[in-house]
């Protein structure tokens, strides 16, 4: 467990993810989602003096933690960039095709969720922000204030998988005409009233808040770009380890890996002559999807939705 500003963060699938990387003492590794450094610290403990670890994060608080770690350990460097941009960063550092492993631990961290000032949670009232990097992009409040009802409904439905997206979006637009949304609790209350069928054990605002967060941070677009960039960065034999926390993320990861196991042949038109190489797999998948153990679920209930998938680059 790492402590940050009074907020606890327990790294999910810590040992399993680092074991899946098969860390080599002299290898170069990327932690695409540094967070509070749980995975990075364990990777560093397995690296030798010639090993290197490059961490990425958009969150300024995570970067501050990373800079403190970098000051202690010269093998580690942290950069304030999305993992979607890791291709550019790796190229700038002359590391393209030389990376032994990439780890992506997706979603929002406990310190982000639990800090009311970040605006991620409907459980704790705070400014309606939701940005991983509060200095860039459009906040959730700004999006809600200006987006057409159809766009808000699309975000709730596509990214939150909310079946009452249209009804909830209309309630949001009706209310914003009277008073703009500035606080998470305010939005959560309107969504709660507009949701006619509450799921047992789940706050009625859960799915809509997820949709907003994913949209504000372009999480699925970043994931698609990051997966492609990670594959290009890896050396042959390098490992890609991805931990996702909801079905939309996991679907993207699963389809990406399945496509590359089949080579490029699936993407070509029928009856088109192709080279044999088009049928040669680019990766192999290591084992089945892995989930948190009973012991981890008991210690950290937020791990219940975690799914880990592992692939190795073949060419």
Curated annotation (Swiss-Prot):
What terms describe the molecular function in GO for this protein? rRNA (cytosine-N4-)-methyltransferase activity
Q: List the transmembrane segments.
A: none
A GO BP term, please?
Answer: rRNA base methylation
Q: Which reaction does it catalyse?
A: cytidine(1402) in 16S rRNA + S-adenosyl-L-methionine = N(4)-methylcytidine(1402) in 16S rRNA + S-adenosyl-L-homocysteine + H(+)
Q: Can you supply one Gene Ontology CC term for this chain's record? A: cytoplasm
Keyword annotations for this protein, in alphabetical order, are: Cytoplasm, Methyltransferase, rRNA processing, S-adenosyl-L-methionine, Transferase
Task: List its EC numbers.
Answer: 2.1.1.199
| Enzyme class, first EC level, given as a word | transferase
Looking up Pfam families in the UniProt record yields: Methyltransf_5
Per the record, the similarity remark reads:
Belongs to the methyltransferase superfamily. RsmH family.
Q: What does this protein do?
A: Specifically methylates the N4 position of cytidine in position 1402 (C1402) of 16S rRNA.
Task: Please identify the protein, giving its name as recorded.
Answer: Ribosomal RNA small subunit methyltransferase H
Give the organism the record lists. Answer: Pseudomonas fluorescens (strain SBW25)
Name of encoding gene? rsmH
